[in-house]
Amino acid sequence: MDTLKLEIVTPEGLIFQGDVKSVTFPGEEGEFGVLPKHASLLSLLKPGVIEIELPDGKKESIVINWGHVNVSENQATALVEGAVPLEGTTESEIAKKIEEAKKLIESASENKAALATVEARIEKAAKIV
């Protein structure tokens, strides 16, 4: 199975690194998916959720405030200002991550409609975790 190498980096350090089956980014012009052997591109990222599908079929979600992504044939590197992985082993840990993610998004945008949309996506992504 073909995979894509994905890195998500913030000023504080590496948030995610690994092989993935696919990844969906919140691009400035709309969401877009990346699969192995994708055409090269550079895109701005807006506040939203990066959705990752791992080779074993499991899914991970990382909320970001803004940044950019550089995609080449078999690698995608996202440099973002802030990120919160939606993960946890207990409901309280996941609830804490959801609150952190909402605060991150609220600090990145004043557009109330966009905030509501992203917050709904955060809640949906957290249910998958």
UniProtKB/Swiss-Prot annotation:
Pfam families: ATP-synt_DE_N (PF02823). Disulfide bonds: none annotated. Its main location: membrane. It is found in: Cell inner membrane. The keyword Membrane applies. It is a peripheral membrane protein. GO terms for cellular component: plasma membrane; proton-transporting ATP synthase complex. GO terms for molecular function: ATP binding; proton-transporting ATP synthase activity, rotational mechanism. NCBIfam families: ATP_synt_epsi. Produces ATP from ADP in the presence of a proton gradient across the membrane. Belongs to the ATPase epsilon chain family. This is ATP synthase epsilon chain. It comes from Nitratiruptor sp. (strain SB155-2).
